[in-house]
Each structure stands twice: as C-alpha cells, then as structure tokens.
Amino acid sequence: MIIKPKIRGFICTTTHPVGCEANVQEQITFTKNKGKIANGPKKVLVVGSSSGYGLSSRIAAAFGCDAATIGVFFEKPGTETKPGTAGWYNSAAFDKFAKAEGLYSKSINCDAFSHEAKQKVIELIKQDLGEIDMVVYSLASPVRRLPDSGEVIRSALKPIGETYTATAVDTNKDCIIEATVEPATEQEIADTVTVMGGQDWELWIKALSEAGVLANNCKTVAYSYIGTELTWPIYWHGALGKAKMDLDRAAKALNDQLSATGGSANVAVLKSVVTQASSAIPVMPLYIAMVFKKMRQEGLHEGCMEQIYRMFSERLYRTDGAKPETDSDNRLRLDDWELRDDIQQHCRDLWPQVTTENLSELTDYREYKAEFIKLFGFGIEGIDYDADVNPYVEFDVIELQ
C-alpha cells in the first residue's frame, strides 16, 4: 500500500516502515562513526527499547559496545492493510541490522509492567547470556496495569495546586494559543507516581537480582527530565515531576543495593527532545522549538542518539574508568548544555514575543514539525513516499499475551 502521514491530535496514526528503518540506520551510522566505547557493557537489557531514548540506548549498546541486547516493548505489528506502530518497525530494523553484524538480539513484545515479562526475560538471560551487566529502564507509558490486582492506573500531565495557563502552540493549526490545564487531584498525583515513578524499575531489578542474572558490576539507569522554570509548572512541579522524584528515590535504594557488588544505579537527566512522549505535554513543543534554535546556533544541538552516546562514552563508561560525574543527588546530567544560562535566558526573553505570525522566524518550529513527522518514518530524504510498501513486517520477536 501507499502510506501517507495522517495526524490526529499529537500523534500520527500512520507510519512508514521504510522511513522507520532509515531512522534506525541513521542512528546506527552516527554511532559507528563516533567509534567503539572501549569498556562498554556486553550484555544489555533495555526495558522500553522501541523508540526515543530507549531505542538509542539499545543502538549505543549494540553498535557502540558490541553488546548482546534484549529489548522489551509494547507495540502493534502491521497487517497487509494497516501500518503497525513506529516502534514495531524500529525494533524490526534494529533486529535486522544487529543480526547482520552477528550481534545477539532478542525482542519481547509484551506489557513490561507484568510479572510474565520479567519471568520471560529472566528465562532468556539464563538460556542465552547467563547474566547481564546493564539494565536501561526507559518506559514512557501513560497507563500501568498493576501486576497483582490487574487494576489499570492512568497518569495525568497536570500541574499541582493551581491552574496553569501559558503560551503554547497548537501543533495541528500551527498557531499560538493560551493553554490552560487544571490542577491534578491528590489521587491523580498518586496515580501518576504509580505509573511513571520508580516502582516498576525496582521490581525489574528485584526480579533480576533474585534470579541471579545480574553481573556483579551491573549498572542500571533510568531516564528523567527536569527542565527549568519555563516548564516546571507542568513538568517538574507537576504530577509528572512527583513521579520523576520517585525515580530519584528508587535510584538511591537501588544504588545502595547494587554498589555492594560493584554495580550502580543512576537517574540520567536528559535534554528535551522531539518524541511522541514530549509532544503530548502542553508547552513542550513551543519550548523545544525555541531551545532547539538557540542550541543549533551555539553548536550544542543533540537528538536522542547524540545524548545517549555521550552518556555512555563520557559518563557511565569513560575510557579512564573513572566514576561518572554526578550532581548532588547522584544523577547523571546530560541536560547540562540545555540548561546553560545564555540558552535559558534566550528562551525566557523570547517566550512573550512569540506570535502565530513570527513563530517560524523566531523559533525552529518548522524543524520541530519535521522531526515530529520523522518519528513515524515520514519526510525523510531519499525515500519515495509514492512507492508501494508492505506494512506487514515480520522479525524475530517473542509475543507474550
């Protein structure tokens, strides 16, 4: 079939398998060009490995460190008449390229919050790898089914305490609007912590540890975003921030546990990037369009892959073997360039000046839109979007019901 982009709200409901493969290829090429990470991990589990930072982590491990990787994700395959999710095609492409280089690659399509997912991964590790020396936790799910009760909990992207009103961009109509978001209830805050906090990360490490499949020097990392006062009301000081603070709590507990055998647990605070997750957060698209333009001008721009390669090579797996630089809360800070005073001051000054008319001139809004559509495999140079493609893409994936 011929597949064209169809956008509804802040998601694109169609995806292009060839475009998604090209995205993965581009990240692999970047990683290979940067060179091998000398003392990188060799057996890596990535929970949430199909897009964004999780996918880049799997690529950095495999193509930057020659690691065997197991990827866990929850995606929909395509059929003969309907495209699957971008994450399905990304994972299929990763698997194809990894196997072509003789790298071990196993993928599990399942609910990562479930007990079954953890048991299946443990079984695979025991059978094929013996143990793992890195666990990347990169889930971005709006809902979580509690593994014991089966209850479904939903998160809320809301401020705390008071209604939040700010200048934002309507990405469907490409115009500047006033966005208003009502505050979260106490229950919504608690639910957001349950879905997006550190509980499931702890459950993964507990299950892997009790099964005896964590190597002595195993490192684990989970991803977070803090931002600045421009986005704090909706993010760090909102319900989502409470969940990310719970991730910090979990990191401390896990680090105490893993450091006893030479391992470590850290939260890595990353920069804002265009992902399906960030596009859903009010004001983030406008902020990203602003900050990207300034960072590009300063030669500091990074996408997911650049960030993760830097985290591996300059933080967790340094050539001198030294411990990574961390902040006072033991976090790895990869948002250091974004948070530079000159970059943030530029955004603060610009925010009140942006109108629908000058949006594309003052910010990188056009580039934001292009990067957004690229997530789904569209708008990529060299791909013939009028050509017939098969949306049904098979690969070596274990399906758990």
Curated annotation (Swiss-Prot):
Q: What class of enzyme is it?
A: oxidoreductase
**Which Enzyme Commission number(s) are on file for it?**
1.3.1.9
Q: Does the keyword Metal-binding apply?
A: no
The residues annotated as the active site are: 235 (proton donor)
- Give binding positions for substrate: 225
What residue ranges are annotated as transmembrane?
Answer: none
Presence of the UniProt keyword Lipid metabolism in the record:
yes
Site (Plays an important role in discriminating NADH against NADPH): which residue positions? 75
Give me any GO biological process, just one.
fatty acid biosynthetic process
Q: Which domain of life is it from?
A: Bacteria
The signal peptide here is none
Q: Which InterPro entries match?
A: Eno_Rdtase_FAD-bd_dom (IPR024906), Enoyl-CoA_Rdtase_cat_dom (IPR024910), FabV-like_NADH_b (IPR050048), Trans-2-enoyl-CoA_reductase (IPR010758)
Q: Which reaction does it catalyse?
A: a 2,3-saturated acyl-[ACP] + NAD(+) = a (2E)-enoyl-[ACP] + NADH + H(+)
The pathway it acts in is: Lipid metabolism; fatty acid biosynthesis
How is this protein organized at the quaternary level? Monomer.
Q: Tell me the protein family, please.
A: Belongs to the TER reductase family.
Instruction: Please name the PANTHER family in this protein's record.
Output: ENOYL-[ACYL-CARRIER-PROTEIN] REDUCTASE [NADH]
The protein's matches in NCBIfam families, at most eight in alphabetical order, are given as:
EnoyACPredFabV, PRK13656.1
- Indicate what this protein is called per its UniProt record: Enoyl-[acyl-carrier-protein] reductase [NADH]
Species assigned in the record: Shewanella sp. (strain W3-18-1)
- Lineage per the UniProt record: Bacteria, Pseudomonadati, Pseudomonadota, Gammaproteobacteria, Alteromonadales
Please state the gene responsible for encoding this protein.
Answer: fabV
